[in-house]
A protein has these predicted regions:
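Short acidic-hydrophobic sequence patches enriched in Asp/Glu that either
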Residues: 26-30, 49, 143
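N-terminal domain-start signal
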Residues: 45-46
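Post-signal peptide N-terminal segment of mature Sec-exported envelope proteins
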Residues: 20-39
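Mature-region segments of soluble proteins
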Residues: 52-63, 67-196
């Protein structure tokens, strides 16, 4: 992560009055529940909602992603919401149920690798059509998978880059000492990854 992105993440953790920039408020609540299913809280580790990761995701997409990515994310979000409506038999983002969202996440992330590769291929083959405004060129599942994968990747990036996780959960040294290339991770950091 670059210093600019890290400062963006830090601002997300300190901002008490926040208005979404890229997503609307209903989408934010819905996506926030998805991020909380991806990284739930436990007794030892705070989850996505406690760390305000949705703020980072919204600001990161708005400030760092390019216009083409904005189109892909918005189009794939629309498809994912349609997919959610079909699978849950609902017609609003306001009355979502966590169990239904969890089932949809399992469907996409626990599917065969070959199915996921097919979705990625389908999405990649239809990028130009999506940019031209035709999301019908890609399957709902392919667009939904792209959206969920993007949100999952950003959630994990935000989690690993958050100050609390960096200082309290991951191995952290503000000024690294000596460099040792081949060491046992269990011995060096008790099996924890280094903070960013």
């Amino acid at each position: 992560l670059t210093p600019a992105v890290l400062s963006l993440l830090q601002s997300c953790q300190n901002d008490l009055d926040w208005n979404p920039v890229f997503f609307d408020s209903n989408q934010i609540k819905f996506i926030s529940e998805i991020t909380n299913l991806i990284i739930p809280s436990s007794e030892e580790v705070p989850g996505s909602n406690e760390l305000n990761l949705i703020r980072f995701i919204d600001l990161y997409i708005s400030n760092v992603k390019n216009n083409d990515d904005h189109i892909f994310i918005q189009s794939s979000l629309v498809s994912f919401i349609e997919n959610y409506y079909i699978k849950s038999k609902k017609n609003s983002l306001i009355n979502y149920e966590i169990e239904e969202l969890d089932e949809i996440l399992k469907y996409f992330f626990k599917s065969d690798v070959s199915k996921q590769e097919l979705w990625v291929s389908d999405f990649n083959n239809s990028k130009n059509s999506i940019l031209d405004g035709s999301i019908e060129s890609s399957s709902n599942d392919a667009l939904s998978f792209y959206f969920l994968k993007t949100i999952r990747d950003l959630t994990i990036t935000a989690f690993k880059g958050s100050e609390y996780i960096g200082k309290n959960i991951l191995a952290f040294r503000p000024v690294p000492g000596q460099q040792k290339g081949c060491v046992d991770l269990l011995e060096t950091t008790n099996g924890r990854a280094w903070t960013i």
